[in-house]
């Protein structure tokens, strides 16, 4: 066992080797390296697979023997300061290493085909391998300085990959936004690290925890300063894991290639913040204010992400807000003291979300030959629909991921999310109500996404999208801004009846172009009849190298939840994950000898599943073609129209829709307050520099110039005159000095 741990430092170096080899090949043999570019996918997958095998072996040894290994190299040592680098192998490290390597391998296999026609193929794989190396270095770090170094490397890689297609202005702006937003958190993290070093005199985790646990409860250090340091550390996690209010970069990060979205949202960047909170949880526990803040930020984020996902039309942005919401669940768990549950949901969500993102990439890949390569069209769910018969494997795996995220048993996310919901009741009923309500919203927007993508008919073949002011039930559209075009004839997507319209609650979609803007007036969408002479192209299923990762992630989505299921009813914690996490940290279940209450578990599960099923049913009712017999909900409309509160309901729906479409007005607030304030300050600084500072400098030059010119014309060229003037000036200064000083 000792022999295996000694070589654990190889794990983060393996993917880094690929990056170095690609760079060396481009430097020495540029033409051959570019011509044989797809060859580099093999060592990328191979080296990361070796890292995965080492991680699995370390995890097995830890499960069997509950061991923790730490190896350090002294870098700088003197009487007052010492800095050591090394690696720490404990249950948290092994969990994260397996997660990063398994998802990373599947993303690499998927990317080989997805990026095969891109000119930046080699650059993409070098960035991707460096990304994996940075994240593996982060999770194996033995102290806060190492964490900060790899933390910045992860941020740099995300900047490069989000802006991979930097020639597109929107991608360049997105990576800049991610970079600037994360700088706020990174600066807070750095200040927190320096503050803790000032308190404890050490960067090592064990020393930090021991000293803080002794000093803070016994008032050995200023509690306000310790709380401030802990808050600054948590601020780094807030930015990296896209928690409110530093979440604004996450939806824009979808401008990068889809495999990067899968990696960022599943196993690397957003998981880094959760990892930091989990690693520093022994420190946060002794500061109750920080624990309350963590849980509060988590519950706000999970609700905010769910509401913002309700009306998105971009399939990747919908998944991005879903990630934000699920990360809120994961952040809520350690805040309420449920460490094991947080890691459990981190694992299950990572595989499910990687499956959904790679599935969306397969969908986008199939749509691009039809609509073009613009993300505004290829990622627009308004142009999709009816893809079931064209991409059946993608549809099946996407359906698995959707059910898992909705919390439907026996898929993975059901087991972990249900534990978070149960623990939230023990901590705060208010938080529990919000968490349960968000579970219903999650089921709604996930099935909305699934139905808009796979149900009904392929909407791209319906030409001449147009708006019409004639009434439909609700006064808002599904996608946004109206387009004033004449309507020739109508064609309904789910039936062959004419004069059927699409509202916010219908199964259809509206206009495909323009910004997403709310409509306060009635807007219905019509489609002109198909021309029989037109020959259409249709989507096609992806290649095997893209489908294989989907199927493998589908298996993970089905079975990875088993690691957290207690199989022994007589003893709590008799599951793989609980044996793995030794020593456990759980403030809500401190009595580990109590048996598992299966009756309580089943009761809570029935409640959570019922809420999810209600969300699924609502989405199916409003967006599914199965209910087309209602003639576009005329029955429901007639019932609701009888109610005198219809106008109030309309206003509520409009408020929710406007909130979701405008990203909760948070981006607008930042743009109008922070951005405009910084630009105003920059303009003021520019004015002061040009007019005041430069004015003073230039003023001295101008005055000297005119004085010189005046003296030049006063002089006659006679030396005797110069001597006279000089003597006169000297005499005047002597007299002034003698009489007045």
From Swiss-Prot:
Q: Which InterPro entries match?
A: NADH_UbQ_OxRdtase_chlpt_su5_C, NADHpl_OxRdtase_5_subgr, ND/Mrp_TM, NU5C-like, Proton_antipo_N
The organism's place on the tree of life at top rank: Eukaryota
* Segments passing through the bilayer: 9-29, 40-60, 89-109, 125-145, 147-167, 185-205, 219-239, 258-278, 280-300, 327-347, 396-416, 425-445, 547-567, 606-626, 721-741
**Short name of any one Pfam family annotated for the protein:** Proton_antipo_C
> Which Enzyme Commission numbers does its entry carry?
7.1.1.-
Chief place of localization: plastid
Q: Please list the reactions this protein catalyses.
A: a plastoquinone + NADH + (n+1) H(+)(in) = a plastoquinol + NAD(+) + n H(+)(out); a plastoquinone + NADPH + (n+1) H(+)(in) = a plastoquinol + NADP(+) + n H(+)(out)
The cellular component terms of Gene Ontology attached to this UniProt record, alphabetical and capped at eight, are: chloroplast thylakoid membrane
Keywords recorded for this protein, A-Z = Chloroplast, Membrane, NAD, NADP, Plastid, Plastoquinone, Quinone, Thylakoid, Translocase, Transmembrane, Transmembrane helix, Transport
For this UniProt entry, the molecular function terms from Gene Ontology, in alphabetical order, are:
NADH dehydrogenase (ubiquinone) activity; quinone binding
Where does the record say this protein resides?
Answer: Plastid, Chloroplast thylakoid membrane
| Alphabetized Gene3D superfamilies for the sequence | 1.20.5.2700
What Gene Ontology terms for biological process does this UniProt record contain? ATP synthesis coupled electron transport; electron transport coupled proton transport
Is Chloroplast set as a keyword in this record? yes
Known function:
NDH shuttles electrons from NAD(P)H:plastoquinone, via FMN and iron-sulfur (Fe-S) centers, to quinones in the photosynthetic chain and possibly in a chloroplast respiratory chain. The immediate electron acceptor for the enzyme in this species is believed to be plastoquinone. Couples the redox reaction to proton translocation, and thus conserves the redox energy in a proton gradient.
Entry similarity comment? Belongs to the complex I subunit 5 family.
Which protein are we looking at? NAD(P)H-quinone oxidoreductase subunit 5, chloroplastic
What taxonomic classification does the UniProt entry list for its organism?
Eukaryota, Viridiplantae, Streptophyta, Embryophyta, Tracheophyta
